[in-house]
């Protein structure tokens, strides 16, 4: 500015606010992690010298992100006025293509609105994508399924007769709307998101081995990447009773997870079991556009074998082909995924609606994790948000 002061301008406003962050009142997001690069000038030495003689500032470097503006806008618009988060990753590289959290805020006037933002009961400054901790609901059945596969090599022979509810030692779990799914194998159990079948599966699991599988899926673990996050938690004890065990198997109970973590999990499944380290910065360029630093994809670790990933993909395809994610079938693109409806109130009327999965199943392109808080599922679901994001990518 003319008076020597500096102002940060955010032309994209609320759409990128959590992931880009703000530079006032402390820093957040990329403004925090990339502050050094933004202030460093990789101009040529003689130019820097000339500028100093003229009392002119050297232009700081430019941080080029991995974010796809169209996907970011699509995710932002798809959430509408709902609270929640969307994370989109490229499974083969770990590039974060979109990261949206709502409610949002305008980073252009954080200083002026600081007190109101800090006292906001909707926590609009909170990046729900990485810091939000949610009951995973039926998306956690992917972990339960993997644990069952590992403990039961003959899992293809699994059979269960669902009559809409399952009781054990005084504890009863109901299927959604108490729907009786009839005779099911493991594929059907995942596709129908059958709570009764998964309660039965949970009771058959060795809890210590189950916990081990959950840890390998990054629960109770550090997550890769450079964003601030909260660790997800799997708390089922080895001496837990039947009720807690059944609830945990279907993704209720005390398990907590972030949308960021679930994006990594489905990204690894899409990538043959191998998780690529998530990253947000593609390159750093100087004022002339010359690249001074380029970030390359990095493998983080193998979460599961390629055959386990392929089997989970088959189950997730069934979810879309004839199960709870059928609203995503018949599009110009293919999807494999898992839905979730997490009850978060005593009366069961308040739910978080989830969808996790990936598109272009034979050569995966987009891994997505959606959580809609307190969703009115008559008007919005995790599936409907994911569909809008996929549609914007494949139909434009």
Tell what function each PLM region has.
Residues 291-296, 384-396:
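Short, gly/Ser/Thr-rich active-site loops of penicillin-recognizing serine hydrolases
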